[in-house]
Amino acid sequence: MTLAASETLRPHEECVPVPDAFDAGLWFIGRIRTPWAQRAECPRRGDPVNGPDCRIVLDARWLSALEGVAGKDRMQVLYWMHLSRRDVVRQNPFFGDGSLGTFALRSPLRPNPIASSLVRLLRVEGNVLTVRGLDCIDGTPLVDLKPEFGLLP
């Protein structure tokens, strides 16, 4: 049992067995530094205007991949919600009294707990990006960075 699997389910929630093996691999390319130590402290949605400054610390090997990023205003940040359960298929959201399928929600409980936030880029200093608009716990693994969809280099 993993740490996340020990969480108590809400009424009307359902789990399934997860596969024994993964279909693909990925590398975490850095870590996200935020003011929140626990999921309960995180906002439900990041605020790119009034949210706190957060830092994305990219592994030094990927430094050259930041070329051209400093000129961007907004970035899409993809990250791995590493403490989330991966076996929940029906959930009882905080705003309702009944269950919905996981794919109908933006909950962190997902088979592949990938999250996406559109953030405001404040500055780039070496391998550290300072941004606003994140909603994850401190130390969350970084999966990828992309410019806002629709913007060309």
Predicted feature descriptions by range:
Residues M1-L118, L122-P153:
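Glycine-rich, low-complexity intrinsically disordered segments
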